[in-house]
């Protein structure tokens, strides 16, 4: 069975200009995933990483202890490798420039949600790490600038996630398909388990927090009712499955077919998910697996960011299901 390291080396020839940098970055992410996997599996045995840290992040959300642990681990691992010029995280207000000689001469920046769904940790529910890699646009040899991070998702060179569930799995793309690697704790190695992953064109699962139904736009309400109606021709009604962890919900739908929706709402007029840390990397993966990612009207990967922590509505998953949801959004578009 091929390991992640072997797979990365085999594919390195696809990026002759990377000079091994992408290999180093992915190796850093692999290391962080193994450390987070270890600590999550011990979470019930120690109070050091469970619960609220007492700090709010830049969005005003409570940071869990494991949020900060994962954030610091990711930053330290990337700094140690010196393969990236800068780092931006959902957990930190500003980007971080790695202002060493190697850092200034590095070609890439990375954006990450170090621990998606961290509120689930205390109740032993799946969580994940999301990452997105871009080639910098500022001159090599100088410190990175905000513009290096403010690129549309269609300029990503790699993206992926790690899901920490019944097993730990790393899924990533470099723009040539999606591949998944399952962690074997006995070997300490990620092994290729899901090659060339493809999301089914349609499915029977819709994932949305229906407790917020009254706050949703009319197009989403109509689509939910469509999912619940009986119709043998379209294999409805669909099944509602919502974990509350983007990575876990998307991963299930990637394997089985389905749609994940986190729309704008009266309490989140711009949506809740972050474009750069969640929307873009998940959208890149979805498209590379044959799916679609939309803000309800337009392709997520074409959005030009205007803020580092910009929010975005997200409709992502099986092609036919996302297209149907978009039809409802256009039909019942609100001013």
Curated annotation (Swiss-Prot):
Cofactor: Mg(2+)
CDD domains, per the entry: FBPase
GO biological process: fructose 1,6-bisphosphate metabolic process; fructose 6-phosphate metabolic process; fructose metabolic process; gluconeogenesis; sucrose biosynthetic process
Domain of life assignment: Bacteria
Location of this chain's protein in the cell: Cytoplasm
Pathway the protein acts in: Carbohydrate biosynthesis; gluconeogenesis
Keyword Heme appears in the UniProt entry: no
CC terms in the record's Gene Ontology section: cytosol
TM helices/strands, residue ranges: none
Cofactor remark from the record: Binds 2 magnesium ions per subunit.
Binding positions for Mg(2+) 1 per the UniProt entry: 90, 113, 115
Family: Belongs to the FBPase class 1 family.
Protein name: Fructose-1,6-bisphosphatase class 1
């Amino acid at each position: 069975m091929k390991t992640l390291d072997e797979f990365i080396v085999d594919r390195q020839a696809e990026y002759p200009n990377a000079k091994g940098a992408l290999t180093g970055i992915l190796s850093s992410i692999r290391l962080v995933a193994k450390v987070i996997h270890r600590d999550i599996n011990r979470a019930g045995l120690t109070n050091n990483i469970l619960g609220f840290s007492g700090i709010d992040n830049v969005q005003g959300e409570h940071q869990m202890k494991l949020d900060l642990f994962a954030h610091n681990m990711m930053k330290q691992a990337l700094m140690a490798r010196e393969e990236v010029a800068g780092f931006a995280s959902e957990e930190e207000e500003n980007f971080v420039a790695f202002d060493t000689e190697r850092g200034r001469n590095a070609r890439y920046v990375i954006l990450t949600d170090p621990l998606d769904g961290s509120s689930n940790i205390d109740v032993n529910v799946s969580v994940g790490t999301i990452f997105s890699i871009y080639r910098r646009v500022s001159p090599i040899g100088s410190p990175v600038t905000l513009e290096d991070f403010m690129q549309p998702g269609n300029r990503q060179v790699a993206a992926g996630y790690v899901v920490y569930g019944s097993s730990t799995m790393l899924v990533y793309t470099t723009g040539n398909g999606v591949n998944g690697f399952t962690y074997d704790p006995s070997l300490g190695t990620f092994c290729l388990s899901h090659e060339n992953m493809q999301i089914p064109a349609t499915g029977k699962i819709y994932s949305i927090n229906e407790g917020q139904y009254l706050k949703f736009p009319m197009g989403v309400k109509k689509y939910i009712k469509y999912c619940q109606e009986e119709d043998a021709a379209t294999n409805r009604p669909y099944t509602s499955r919502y974990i509350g962890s983007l990575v876990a919900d998307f991963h299930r739908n990637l394997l089985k077919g389905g749609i994940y929706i986190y729309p704008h709402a009266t309490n989140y007029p711009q949506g809740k998910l972050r474009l750069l840390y969640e929307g873009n990397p998940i959208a890149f993966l979805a498209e590379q697996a044959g799916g679609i990612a939309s803000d309800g009207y337009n392709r997520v990967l074409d959005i030009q960011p205007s803020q580092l922590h910009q929010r975005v509505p997200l409709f992502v998953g099986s092609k036919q299901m996302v297209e149907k949801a978009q039809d409802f959004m256009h039909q019942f578009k609100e001013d």
